[in-house]
């Protein structure tokens, strides 16, 4: 399993970014900078820049967090059982650095039927047209 990013990264993360990526926290719903992003491009892990999701797989699930129906590649993310909060969920972590991203649920659209519910605070986005980077 991949390790968390170097300790020096902690100094660069905001409190909410640290809470989400390093402590498996959750940002408040409808608060993330990338929730309503409609631009074409790639969503990366905030901690290591691993490509995680393509904009073409993003959809509005109404849940308050960016939602995607599949990762960019098979090994972009890893899955862990999460039995916290008296429920069973599947946690999603970066496949490269192990940063917490969010959870995946079996109620998404086709072609996968999955909904990757991802914290904006765990992501950065690179616009494919301008190269501009936005940090969630």
UniProtKB/Swiss-Prot annotation:
It holds the Pfam family SelR. Zn(2+) binds at residues 45, 48, 94, 97. The keyword Oxidoreductase applies. The active site is at 117 (nucleophile). One of its GO terms (molecular function) is peptide-methionine (R)-S-oxide reductase activity. Binds 1 zinc ion per subunit. The zinc ion is important for the structural integrity of the protein. One of its GO terms (cellular component) is cytoplasm. Keywords: Metal-binding, Oxidoreductase, Zinc. PANTHER family: METHIONINE SULFOXIDE REDUCTASE, METHIONINE-R-SULFOXIDE REDUCTASE B1. This is Peptide methionine sulfoxide reductase MsrB. The gene is msrB.
